[in-house]
Amino acid sequence: MDQMSPDNINGVILAVSSSIFIGSSFIIKKKGLKKAGASGVRAGEGGYGYLKEPWWWAGMITMIVGEVANFAAYAFAPAILVTPLGALSIIFSAVLAHFILKEKLHMFGILGCILCVVGSTTIVLHAPHEQKIESVKQIWQLAIEPGFLVYSAVIVIVVAILIFYYEPRYGKTHMIVYVGICSLMGSLTVMSVKAVAIAIKLTFSGTNQFKYFNTWIFILVVATCCILQINYLNKALDTFNTAVISPVYYVMFTTFTIIASMIMFKDWASQSGLKIATELCGFVTILSGTFLLHKTKDMGNSASGRGSISMPTRDTPVFTNSGSGRSSSSDKVAS
């Protein structure tokens, strides 16, 4: 194992801080969505009453702080290192949901959290070093290579189909629609965020990158994708259980981001097969943890007041909401 570079260490510190804030923001925002939904049209039904709810804004501010830290992390470390550390936000989200929203975290959920930590640590210790970037134009050349252009086109087409065809029909019953939109757009967001973060870093170092039109195109992509992600993430949070949204969103978002980073930045080009395999094992470990969190989400929430365990059955829909968001047992939480 090579010694971690100073830039990678800075990236890890920022990414972990980001996870704490972002994981907390899920819970704070959902509390705001619940309070707003109790007195008006819910976000899942197209309402925007949450914009008047202080709890929702507190959650947004917390998320912004986390995203700023995450943004800065991409200026120092490769996406393959920074993005998987988002698993830590799942832990904070699940634990806070247990205590604040009363969305119970079973012992297998705790095991899932531990697996996420182990997998994240494995990736941190074996992550590739960031390639040297001297200008935003260098990133632009990577972005307009045929491979990444094809990837971007496929993402845009799939997202358009999800928004205009599947969301009106299945959005309220199939979580994968909302989460899919957020995750797919998120992979493009991360690539653009990394470009903007590096541009800011280089500008503060004395080389102004904002004189290039390329930088402003990356900023436009970030703004557009973020607006879409916030809108559909709000709908997902208002309709489905937070403890389910967080891990599934993480898995999809991280998978597509790693694919995008491999295509655009070719992060693994300088690594040995053993290191790549170790990083993949770390990622699979994280996926196992998120799977446990998802599949055992209803354990300990049975009707028995003594906390008997209700095992999920084979017929339990994995990516659907069996009833309306208002009637879900996990959402019956006092404001």
From Swiss-Prot:
Cytoplasmic compartment spans: 29-55, 101-104, 165-179, 234-244, 294-335
Cellular compartments per GO CC: early endosome; plasma membrane
Database matches in InterPro entries: Mg_trans_NIPA (IPR008521)
Biased composition (Low complexity): 322-335
Pfam families cross-referenced by the UniProt entry: Mg_trans_NIPA
Transmembrane segments: 8-28, 56-76, 80-100, 105-125, 144-164, 180-200, 213-233, 245-265, 273-293
Record field: compositional bias (Polar residues): 303-321
Gene Ontology MF annotations: magnesium ion transmembrane transporter activity
Localization, UniProt: Cell membrane; Early endosome
Keywords of this entry: Cell membrane, Endosome, Ion transport, Magnesium, Membrane, Transmembrane, Transmembrane helix, Transport
Topology with respect to the bilayer: Multi-pass membrane protein
Region of interest (Disordered), residue spans: 303-335
Stretches of the chain found on the membrane's Extracellular side: 1-7, 77-79, 126-143, 201-212, 266-272
One GO term (biological process): magnesium ion transport
Subunit text: Homodimer.
Described purpose of this protein according to its UniProt entry: Acts as a Mg(2+) transporter. Can also transport other divalent cations such as Fe(2+), Sr(2+), Ba(2+), Mn(2+) and Co(2+) but to a much less extent than Mg(2+).
Assigned protein family: Belongs to the NIPA (TC 2.A.7) family.
Protein name: Probable magnesium transporter NIPA1
Species of provenance: Arabidopsis thaliana (Mouse-ear cress)
Source lineage: Eukaryota, Viridiplantae, Streptophyta, Embryophyta, Tracheophyta
